[in-house]
UniProtKB/Swiss-Prot annotation:
Keyword field contains Repeat: no
Database matches in SUPFAM superfamilies: Zn-binding ribosomal proteins
Gene Ontology MF annotations: structural constituent of ribosome
Name of the encoding gene: rpmF
Bias (Basic residues) ranges: 1-18
Family: Belongs to the bacterial ribosomal protein bL32 family.
Entry's Gene Ontology BP terms: translation
Protein name: Large ribosomal subunit protein bL32
Residue numbers spanned by region Disordered: 1-20
Length: 65
């Protein structure tokens, strides 16, 4: 198994690791069929609690305010 001959500096390591977050795409949003608010795809709506036409969670008052 290969072993590094010299240690990589902290800045070199951090530069390599930082590129991962630049390549991530923002989550895709869609309109909720029940209330019309934007929601993340394949997740229950935070505002009304519906997913695929059914009430799956109770909406909390904190998110609406």
């Amino acid at each position: 198994m290969a072993v590094p001959k010299r240690r990589h500096s902290k800045s070199r390591t951090r530069k390599r690791r930082s590129t991962y977050y630049n390549e991530l795409e923002p989550p895709q949003l869609m309109e909720c069929n029940n209330c019309g608010n934007p929601k993340v795809m394949h997740r229950a709506c935070k505002h009304c609690g519906h997913y695929r036409g059914r009430q799956v969670i109770e909406p909390s008052d904190e998110l609406i305010a």
